[in-house]
C-alpha cells in the first residue's frame, strides 16, 4: 500500500494548530544561536475557534468544559505545545507527532504526567516545606487531615498533567477516628466534605483535579505493627488495631459516593481503587455497600491481587524495588490512573498501530521494523522530557514536587498502543482482527516485541519504561481523523463523521454482549501491559442487585487473570428526578407527570469515558461515535442466585488463566494454566468471529 505524501503541516486540526515548513536538522535541544525557525500561532484563530467551538479539541477532554479557564488553558497550551515540538524535540519527533505516526501526550503542559504520593508522610509532617508559602503542622483531627489532603492534591495537580494518587486512604486515616472517638455521623460528615471539595473545578482550565484513592479494606501486613503519629505524637496503638475505624471510614466513603451530589450525579473523583486479595471479605456490611454502589454507578476500580506475588503494602516499598533489575519490566502499580507511592510516569507516547497495519499490509516483519523506528522516536522524546522536567524540578519551577518528591528516578517513561484491532484488520486485508485466533496472535506478538524493546531501553538509558494501554481519549480520534484525510482506504471504526480506533488491544465495542467471553478473550492481552490497563464491563443499565454485582466481580476476578476491572452501567440524570437507570435521553417520569402536550425534559446520560465518569454530551467526536456503536454487556443470568444469601459468597481464590509469554511482570494477575471453567462456555461456543 503506497504511503501518502509527507507534507509541511499547516493543518489547523493537527495537535498544536500551528503551521510552518519542515524544520531543518537541529540539536535535540536547540541553543539560542541555532534555534529552529519560530512557530507562528494565529491569535485570531486560536481564540475564535475556541469561542465558536469549531475546533474539536475544545471537547477533547471530557473533564474540561467550555469556559474562560478553558480558553486560557487552550491558548497557553498551544504555545507550550509548539515550544516542546519546535524547541525541545528533534525534527523527526515533531514530524511524527504532527503527522499522526505517534502522539506525544500532554504537550500543552510543561510538567510530568502522573504521580503517587505518600499519604503517611503528609499526615506525619503536615503540608508545607515550601519557602514563602503557607505551612501546616501535622494534622491532629480527621477534618484537618482531609483538608490537608485536598490542598495537597489540588496544589500538586497544578504541577502535573495527569492523575494524582494516594494509597491506603482507610488505613492511614483510621488513627484520627480512634484518637477523637468519632461517631459514624461525624466520620460521614468529614468524608462528605472531602469528596465535595475534590470535585470543585479548581484546577487550571476549570477542571476538577484528577485524583485517585486506593483503599486497603483490611490493614496491610507492612503497617500492621507500625505505630501511627497523630499531630506529630505517637499513638498508644498500631495500625493493625484499627479495623473498626477502617470500617467506619469505608462505610462513610461508600455512603457518600453512592448518594452522589445534590442532583443525584455521581462524583467523578476521586476514582476509588479497591484491592481484592485472598482474604477479601465479600460478605461484610461494607461489601454490601460497595457492590450496591458499583451496581448503581460503577465507580470503583478493582485491583486483582488474587494469585499475585505482590501485596497491597508493596506500594510503599515499590520505589525501592524499581531499581533492582533493569532487565525486568515492572508494574507501576495501582491501575490506569493510580501510581504507587513516590512513583508515576514522566510522560506518555502512544503509537498509531492502525496506520502501521495499513502501510505494511501483508508484511508483519516490515510492520515490526517500522514500529521499532517509532519506539526509538518515542524514547527520544521521553528521555528529553525527563531531562527538561528534572532540570526544572531542581531549579524550583515545581516547588511542591521538589519538596515532596525531589527526583524522577523512580518515575516511568510510558509507551502505549492504540488501534491494535484496526492494525490487524489493515495488515490482513480485513481477513483477521482481534476477534480471530490469528489476529489475536499477531497482537500478542506485537506486544511481546514492545516489551522486549522496553527492556532494551531500560538497559540503555538506566531509566524505567512501561507498556500501557493508554486511554487515548483524544488521541484515538486524532489518529483516525488524520488517517482518514491521508489514507482514504484505511479501515477504521465509526463513521465518516465520527471515526475512531478501538482503544489499545480491546475488542471492538460491538463484538459481544457476553462479559465472560470478553474476559476470556482479553485476559492474555491484558497481562502484557506493565503500565495502566483495565477491562471495563460496560452495561446498559444498573446491575439488578448488589448480590448480582458482587457475583459478577467475584467470578471475573477469581476465574480470569485480568489485572484491573470495572463494572460500568449507563445511567441518566433528570434535573427534576435525579438518578435514572439506563440511557434516558429524556425523562419518562417527567413525560408521565407533565402530559402529552408538554415538551420533553432532557436528561444527562452518564457513562465512563476511558476511565472516569462524565456526561456523554461532553465526549469528543470520536468518543461519541464509539458510544453510539457500543453493544453493552448483558447481565449474565442467575448471578444473584449463584451468589446465595448474604454471608455465603465464596472468598477470593487464585484465578485460572492463560500464561503470557516473555518476561513475566511483577504485579497483579500473573499467568497460569487455564483449566476448563463454566464461565468460559460462551467463549468456546462463539468460536472465531
Where are each of the predicted segments found?
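Charged, amphipathic alpha-helical regulatory modules used
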Residues: 2-5, 407, 628-629
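Intrinsic, low-complexity terminal and presequence regions
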Residues: 572-647, 680-689
Amino acid at each position: 500500500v503506497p504511503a501518502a505524501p509527507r507534507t509541511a503541516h499547516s493543518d489547523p486540526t493537527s495537535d498544536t494548530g500551528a503551521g510552518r515548513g519542515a524544520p531543518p536538522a537541529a540539536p535535540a535541544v536547540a541553543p539560542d544561536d541555532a534555534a529552529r525557525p519560530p512557530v507562528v500561532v494565529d491569535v485570531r484563530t486560536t481564540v475564535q475557534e475556541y469561542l465558536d467551538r469549531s475546533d474539536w479539541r475544545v471537547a477533547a477532554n471530557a473533564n474540561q468544559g467550555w469556559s474562560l479557564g478553558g480558553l486560557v488553558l487552550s491558548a497557553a497550551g498551544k504555545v507550550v505545545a509548539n515550544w516542546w515540538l519546535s524547541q525541545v524535540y528533534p525534527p523527526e519527533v515533531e514530524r511524527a507527532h504532527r503527522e499522526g505516526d505517534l502522539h506525544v501526550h500532554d504537550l500543552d503542559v510543561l510538567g510530568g504526567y502522573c504521580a503517587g504520593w505518600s499519604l503517611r508522610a503528609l499526615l506525619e509532617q503536615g503540608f508545607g516545606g515550601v519557602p514563602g508559602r503557607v505551612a501546616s503542622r501535622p494534622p491532629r483531627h480527621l477534618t484537618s487531615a482531609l483538608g490537608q489532603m485536598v490542598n495537597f492534591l489540588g496544589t500538586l495537580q497544578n504541577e502535573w498533567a495527569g492523575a494524582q494518587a494516594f494509597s491506603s486512604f482507610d488505613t492511614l486515616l483510621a488513627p484520627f477516628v480512634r484518637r477523637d472517638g468519632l461517631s459514624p455521623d461525624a466520620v460521614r460528615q468529614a468524608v462528605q466534605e472531602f469528596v465535595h471539595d475534590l470535585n470543585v473545578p479548581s484546577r487550571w482550565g476549570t477542571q476538577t483535579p484528577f485524583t485517585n484513592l486506593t483503599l486497603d479494606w483490611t490493614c496491610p501486613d507492612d503497617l500492621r505493627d507500625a505505630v501511627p503519629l497523630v499531630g506529630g505524637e505517637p499513638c498508644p496503638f498500631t495500625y493493625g488495631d484499627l479495623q473498626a475505624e477502617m470500617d467506619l471510614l469505608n462505610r462513610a466513603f461508600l455512603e457518600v459516593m453512592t448518594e452522589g451530589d445534590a442532583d443525584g450525579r455521581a462524583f467523578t473523583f476521586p476514582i476509588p481503587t479497591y484491592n481484592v486479595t485472598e482474604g477479601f471479605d465479600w460478605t461484610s456490611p461494607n461489601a454490601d455497600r460497595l457492590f450496591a454502589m458499583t451496581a448503581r454507578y460503577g465507580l470503583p476500580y478493582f485491583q486483582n491481587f488474587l494469585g499475585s506475588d505482590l501485596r497491597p503494602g508493596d506500594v510503599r516499598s515499590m520505589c525501592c524495588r524499581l531499581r533492582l533489575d533493569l532487565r525486568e519490566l515492572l508494574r507501576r502499580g495501582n491501575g490506569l490512573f493510580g501510581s504507587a507511592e513516590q512513583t508515576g510516569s514522566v510522560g506518555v507516547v502512544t503509537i498509531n498501530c492502525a496506520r502501521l497495519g495499513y502501510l505494511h499490509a501483508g508484511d508483519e516483519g516490515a510492520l515490526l521494523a517500522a514500529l521499532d523506528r517509532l519506539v526509538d522516536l518515542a524514547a527520544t522524546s521521553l528521555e528529553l522530557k525527563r531531562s527538561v522536567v528534572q532540570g526544572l524540578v531542581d531549579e524550583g519551577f515545581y516547588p511542591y514536587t521538589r519538596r515532596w518528591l525531589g527526583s524522577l528516578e523512580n518515575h516511568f517513561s510510558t509507551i502505549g498502543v492504540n488501534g491494535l484491532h484496526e492494525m490487524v484488520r489493515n495488515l490482513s486485508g480485513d481477513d483477521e482482527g482481534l476477534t480471530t485466533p490469528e489476529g489475536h496472535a499477531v497482537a500478542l506478538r506485537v506486544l511481546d516485541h514492545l516489551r522486549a524493546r522496553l527492556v532494551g531501553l531500560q538497559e540503555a538509558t538506566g531509566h524505567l519504561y512501561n507498556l500501557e494501554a493508554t486511554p487515548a481519549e483524544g488521541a484515538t480520534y486524532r489518529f483516525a481523523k488524520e488517517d482518514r484525510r491521508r489514507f482514504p482506504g484505511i479501515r477504521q471504526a465509526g463513521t465518516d463523521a465520527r471515526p475512531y480506533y478501538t482503544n489499545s488491544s480491546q475488542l471492538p465495542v460491538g463484538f459481544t454482549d457476553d462479559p465472560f467471553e470478553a474476559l476470556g478473550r482479553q485476559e492474555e492481552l491484558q497481562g502484557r501491559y506493565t503500565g495502566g490497563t483495565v477491562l471495563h464491563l460496560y452495561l446498559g443499565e444498573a446491575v439488578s442487585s448488589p448480590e448480582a454485582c458482587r457475583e459478577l466481580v467475584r467470578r471475573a476476578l477469581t476465574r480470569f487473570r485480568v489485572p484491573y476491572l470495572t463494572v460500568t452501567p449507563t445511567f441518566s440524570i433528570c434535573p427534576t428526578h435525579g438518578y435514572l437507570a439506563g440511557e434516558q435521553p429524556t425523562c419518562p417520569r417527567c413525560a408521565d407527570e407533565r402530559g402529552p402536550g408538554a415538551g420533553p425534559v432532557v436528561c444527562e446520560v452518564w457513562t465512563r469515558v476511558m476511565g472516569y465518569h462524565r456526561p456523554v454530551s461532553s465526549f469528543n467526536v470520536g468518543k461519541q461515535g464509539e458510544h453510539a456503536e457500543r453493544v453493552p454487556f448483558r447481565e449474565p443470568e442467575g448471578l444473584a442466585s449463584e451468589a446465595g444469601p448474604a454471608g455465603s459468597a465464596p472468598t477470593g481464590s487464585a484465578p485460572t488463566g492463560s500464561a503470557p509469554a516473555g518476561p513475566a511482570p511483577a504485579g497483579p494477575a500473573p499467568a497460569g494454566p487455564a483449566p476448563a471453567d463454566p464461565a468460559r462456555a460462551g467463549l468456546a461456543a462463539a468460536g472465531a468471529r
